[in-house]
Design a protein with these regions (language model features):
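Canonical tetratricopeptide repeat
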Residues: 80, 114, 148-152
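Helix-start (N-cap) detector for alpha-helical repeat units in TPR-like alpha-solenoids
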Residues: 41, 75-76, 109-110, 142-143
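Alpha-helical segment of the N-proximal tetratricopeptide repeat
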Residues: 39-70
Length: 165
């Protein structure tokens, strides 16, 4: 009987220690450090992208240039600079920015779509198809960029009209 009582007390003490340690570990440290990485919002990029998609290309370029000053490795900002310049008819500038975006991120889907559209504007569907092939290898199960560029190429081949792709 005495052995059972000792065993019971020992078990109770052990369980109590385990429970207390679990609570301490669950509480974590008392400092304010966050172990999760904090995503920094680039207001210049967001404003530039919004203006570009609303047809305000010159204003977009101003914001996007500020964005790349702050983050020269932002492939998205370079892509949108290419987009804005393409829409303004600044083809050489557009190529410069698209190529920079692809140098930073060779698998950037948006850039492959947009540079493909630029090649269509210049009546170079074969080069557009090269970027469609890139998208095909990047988007294993399909993606909007692939579908959109494919349709633009098909439309170009049907009409042979150089437009604002």
């Amino acid at each position: 009987m005495k052995i059972k009582k000792i065993f019971f007390i020992f078990s109770l003490a052990t369980s109590s220690l385990i429970f207390t340690n679990s609570l301490i570990l669950a509480a974590g440290s008392s400092d304010d450090e966050n172990s999760e990485p904090v995503e920094v919002v680039d207001a210049d990029y967001i404003n530039g992208k919004e203006r570009a998609y609303n047809g305000k290309y010159k204003a977009a370029i101003e914001y996007l240039e500020k964005s790349i000053e702050n983050d020269p490795k932002n492939a998205d900002a370079f892509n949108m600079l290419g987009y804005s310049n393409r829409k303004l008819g600044n083809n050489e500038e557009a190529f410069k920015y698209y190529n920079k975006a692809l140098k930073l991120d060779p698998r950037h889907r948006g850039t492959h779509e947009y540079i493909g559209r630029l090649y269509l504007n210049l009546s170079q569907p074969e080069k557009a198809k090269m970027h469609l092939d890139e998208l095909d290898s990047i988007c294993l199960f399909g993606c909007d960029e692939y579908t959109t560029l494919k349709k633009a190429i098909e439309d170009f081949e049907k009409t042979k009209v150089v437009g604002n792709y």
